[in-house]
Regions:
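Short, low-complexity, intrinsically disordered N-terminal peptides in bacterial proteins
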Residues: 1-5
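Conserved beta-strand-loop-alpha-helix hinge in the C-terminal portion
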Residues: 222-244
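ABC family nucleotide-binding domain
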Residues: 6-214, 218
Length: 244
């Protein structure tokens, strides 16, 4: 694990949706750090704020108050153009719904963010990712010709292709069966252990969380516990205590 500046951190994060009597406090004073070179999972019951936390940490949503840093950059100091550039250059995203472009091949989807940015992909690195996720025979296929697990492996390779400082994964196995889930999660864990990548994953699945090195538990917009060296059984027991 790398030392020094965290890959991302939040201080006293508050997120309020709505106003007056209809206001909902989705994040209620959260402070959290995600170390570089670590695989972290965020868990909690439905409505606990876990996806809101990830979206605010990744610059996809704005916080009501508090500070979010990606590396040493505070997001609130950036204008829209600078924030877009930071998300493109320093953050990788993996979503539950894959978010692949249906008219592009797997290979074209993997390098799409760099193509849009006008940057030449590092071919040796992209080739290594393709072989690690086992997609070499499928590179010329479009998403409709791939299984859900294969599509998510394309999305995972795309997230890492530009060597981002941090990857945020929002329920990356939510649409997958257990075998496909294990393949995607195994790749994310390998990316941390062998490639020194940083991954922060939101999940509701204790088995998925067990692939992480650290699990942060949320309830009612607050961090209520965390666990290192998690197992599916220990995570499930803790979640039962949170009422999910």
């Amino acid at each position: 694990m790398s030392n020094g500046t965290p890959a991302a951190r939040g201080t006293n994060l508050v997120k309020v949706y709505g106003e007056g009597d209809a206001a909902v406090r989705a994040l209620d004073g959260i402070s959290v750090e995600f170390a570089a070179g670590q695989f972290s999972a965020i868990m909690g019951p439905s409505g606990s704020g876990k996806s809101t936390l990830m979206h605010c940490m990744a610059g996809l949503d704005t916080i009501t108050s508090g500070q979010v840093y990606v590396g040493d950059v505070e997001l609130s100091t950036l204008n829209d153009k600078e924030l877009t550039r930071l998300r493109r250059d320093r953050i990788g995203f993996i979503f539950q719904a894959y978010n692949l472009v249906p008219t592009l091949t797997a290979a074209e989807n993997i390098t799409l963010p760099m193509d849009i940015a006008g940057r030449e992909p590092d071919k040796a690195w992209v080739d290594r990712l393709i072989d690690t996720v086992g997609l070499r025979p499928r590179l010329s296929h479009r998403p409709s010709e791939l299984s859900g697990g294969q599509q998510q492996r394309v999305a995972a390779a795309r997230a890492l292709a530009s060597r981002p400082g941090i990857v945020f994964a929002d329920e990356p196995t939510g649409n997958l069966d257990s075998r496909a889930s294990a393949e995607v999660l195994g790749f994310l864990r390998t990316s941390v252990r062998e490639f020194d990548q940083t991954v922060v994953m939101v999940t509701h699945d204790p088995s998925a969380a067990s692939y992480a090195e650290r699990v942060v538990f949320l309830a009612d917009g607050r961090i209520v516990d965390e666990m290192t060296e998690p197992t599916a059984e220990k995570v499930l027991d803790r979640m039962k205590g949170l009422g999910d």
